[in-house]
Each structure stands twice: as structure tokens, then as C-alpha cells.
Amino acid sequence: MRMVDDYKMVLHNSAIVINNCSPNDFPTLSRRFHIYDPVRHRLDPLGIYYDQANRKLYMPRGIDVDFVKRKVQTSMEDEFTSTVVHNHQYGYVTKKIGMKKRPRDDTQMEALKFVLCKDKYQRNSGKSQFGINLNTGGGKTFLCSCILSYLGIRSIVITAQSGILDQWKVRLQEYTDIEESEIVKIEGGPMISRILNGTSTLANKSLYLCTHSTLQNYGSTHGWDKIGELFKKLGIGIKFFDEAHQNFQNMALIDFAARDVWRTYYVTATPSRSDRQEDIIYKLYMKNVPSIDLFNPEVDPHTNYIAIKYNSCPKPADVNACKNSVYGLSNPPYIDYLMRNERFWVMFDYIFSLIYKTGGRALFYIGTNAGILKVKQRILFNYPELYNDIGIYTSISEHKQEDKNKKYILTTTKSAGAGEDIAHLKYSVILAEPFKSEVLARQTLGRTRDPNTTYIELVDVGFKQLIAYYNAKKPVFSKYASGSKVMTVDNPKLANLGEETRLSIRTRFRNVLEFNVHGPIDAITYVEGPKMMPAVYFGNNSLNRTLAE
């Protein structure tokens, strides 16, 4: 009887394995999964993995099998053999999980039929990979909860950040009646080792949560075959990749290591990569993976896009200092330049004053931690009463999760990127973190989930690279924003805005207590004598109190 390794090509649920080979055996096939690194001037593999010790090439299951077969056959002199592996060994949840909520609309109901292969989607019941490409706020976590409840198969959720795992746990307990003890967060290599050694009591739970970095660190240290053993030990039958477009290579390695897991769901609102080369390979990776995208341009857009163009008037030396020979513009020196540019601060004061007057929570994107601290200082200088309302949501904050609940949040696109759930945001402001990526544009647009919200982008036309960034993202906002508006601030208008803001702040500080004190104040009562005396004096006589015995 033939063993699996005796076949030249083996089809698993989430991988194609070519045995006894070298990547040089079929260069045209291998080259399609390599990208050029302009910094190190070399080709790096992406979406594939070659096990040199065992002479095995791992490729994505979503590509055309016949195409791979032809390429492998042309490199062989011996007979070509292949087989399909159906090794579905998984565990079930320890207790039936019920749903607390029903699908909120027809869109969620249609998506639910897709993920469970019901009605017209029954043809996908033999598939092992599915793409859930719903828009931000479309209920992707709810659908995954329904999958766990309906199928009752042990599952694992894999995300980029530990904080996102906490969001998953909260949402799963909100949508289902799963017991908290049945949700296990896998943290660190020692915990994985205990599970593999059989010395942990956590190997028979219903749902596991883990980050890409935890699995990547353990796999690169102990071998990726250990990740496959981990999934078998836990009885994992379903794996969910949250924000599947991120950590692409790591996701592929997990797919290859845990290639016999029954089903894999790739969950993302933006099934694309920012880099063009990487996006081509990502699309190839997902080519034959059935997916669903129910975006409705008549109903789903809910955030208005406003581009505010101004000229920071950089000197030639400033432009040269911000240049990058590979990427065109280097963000850190550009942001440092903005922090020293008076025109930028005029625009910031104007934008912040509008948000302050209209009310509502706001998220500001600033590309560096140094820039974030400068912006915070500026706000506190002009609005000292907001000391407890400003949060920094990056690694420099000791209370990062608490700061995410503040009224005004200063962050970066990396810290508050894909998958972040920040409730009741009214404004998202791209203040000092320019980017060209259409994927990032959709992600940042998706941070405001409530209706009638606003997305503001400050565009510095003094740099030609930033004009190109703005033009590259326009199609995204045309499609996914509820409306688009462009506001141009020329030099005279900018001067007027600066004067208006200066006078407004001056007026605020003239009667500072009127801004900082809300309602009547009970002054101190003195009982030393019968004499009537004013105890506390304010700049405004209406706030004075006369105190009696």
C-alpha cells in the first residue's frame, strides 16, 4: 500500500504538497510566488514554502490544480502520481453552543447561508476553504459565532494582535451562550509546549484564540510541523483567520502546517494587499476559494469623505530631506517636518476647533509617537480642560486599552488598523500619516461604523508624492464613502483661518473659568463672625457668592 509521501502531488484541505523535489525543478511555477525586494535586491518567496530537509514544496490549495499538475509533469521523467487526502480528525465542542441573537437583516441571512453551504450555496459543501469578505460592520464576527454554534466543531481564531482577540472573546460571549471557561487564549511558547507534552488541562476546550506572532515564534523555533501537531492535539476542525489579508506569509505557513484541518475561513473586509506584487500573489492564493461580498452601494456607505488641501510651502531642502529613493516619500522625516511647520498647526487648530464645537468622538492618525506627543501638547495648550479626554492608542501608552475609550484618540494606522472596534466614533482624521494604499484607505474609512459620520484627510499639496497618494485613493472613497467633498485652503484663506483661530482661543482664555466651570459653585461658609463677606472671587461677577454666618 502506498504511503502519502510516495505520491508526487498530494492535495490536502489547505495545501498542495509536491514531494521529492527542488524549487528549481519547475522555475516558472515557483517564480509566480516570489516578489522582488527593492531594498535588498533579491527575490523572496511569498505564499509558498520549501522544506529543504524533506524536499517538499508546499503550495496554496486555492490555485489551479491542473496548472500545477502540468508544470510538475513537464519536469518529470517518471510517472506522475497524485492523491487527495481526507483526514478529518477533529473534536467537538464540549457543550452545545446557542445563539443569543438572530441575523439583523437579509444581508446577514444571505451570508449565513453561504458560510453554512445552504440553499444555492450547497454546491460548496465539499469545499474546505471559504472567504468572508463583508464590509466593516457587516457582521463577520457574528457569522463566525453562527458557524461555531451550528457545526459544533472545535475552532481556533487567529488574529494579528492580542487586543483583537479580546474583542473576539467579548463579541462571542455577546452573540452566544458559550461559557467563559470554554474559551482559551493561547499565549507564549511554554503554553504550547505544555499542550503538546500533555501536561496541560486546556486541550479539550471548545474555542481557542491565538495571535500570528505566537504561532510564528513557536514554528520558526521548534519547526512548523509542531504547529500541525498542536492543531491535532487540540482537535481543531475549523480555523478562522481574522483580517486574512494581513500576515499573509504567516497565514500560508499555518495553512501548510495544519493542512488537514477540515475547514478554513478567511475573514476580511479588504481581500487585497497594499503592495502590488503581494496583491497579485494573494489573489492567486485565493483564486479558487469561494467567497462572498454583499456590499450594497445604495445602503452600506455611511461615512462622508472630506479632503482638505493646503500647501505647507516646503523649501527644496525640506522636500529632499523627506525623499525616499525606494518609496518616494519617507514618513518619519515628513512628519517631523510637519511638527515644525506653522501652516500645519493652523490647519490642525482649525480642524480640531470644528470637531470640538460639533461634539463627538474623534480618532486622529499621526504616523510617529513623537508626533502624537506634539499633537497632544498642542491640544492641552489650547484646551486644558480636555486633560482627561485625550487618549494615546499606541505602544507608548501604559493604559492603551483605557485610552481607546477616551473622547479624542491619537494613534497610528498600525495601532488602530484592521479589525479594531472603537465604538461611537464620529470623526476619523488622517492628520499626519500619509499613505497611498487603497487597502489602508478602506480600513481607516471603516473605523467609523455609525451612520452620518465623517472622514477628514489633510492633503499637503506642497509635496507631489502626496498629490499622487490622494489621487490613488479617490476611487476608494468614490465607491465606499457616502459622499465626497474637496476643500481647498489657499494662502489668503489659511491666513484668515489662523487669525480666526487665534482670536477664538484668546476669547476662551479671557474668561477661562466660564469655560472650565459648569453650573453654580457652592463657596466655603465662614462661621467666625456675623459679618457678611465675599469668600471667592471670579473674573465674572455673576459667579461671586456672598457668604453669611
Place the predicted regions along the sequence by residue.
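A conserved SF2-helicase RecA2
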Residues: 454-509
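Conserved interdomain linker/interface between the two RecA-like ATPase lobes of SF2 helicase motors
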Residues: 292-355
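Conserved Walker A/P-loop ATP-binding site and its immediately adjacent core
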Residues: 152-174, 369
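Conserved two-lobed SF2 helicase motor
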Residues: 203-220, 404-417
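Conserved RecA-like P-loop NTPase helicase motor core
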Residues: 395-476
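Post-DEXD/H (motif II) to motif III coupling segment of the RecA-like Helicase ATP-binding lobe
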Residues: 246-300
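Walker A/P-loop
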Residues: 124-147
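Conserved pre-motif I regulatory segment
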Residues: 82-130
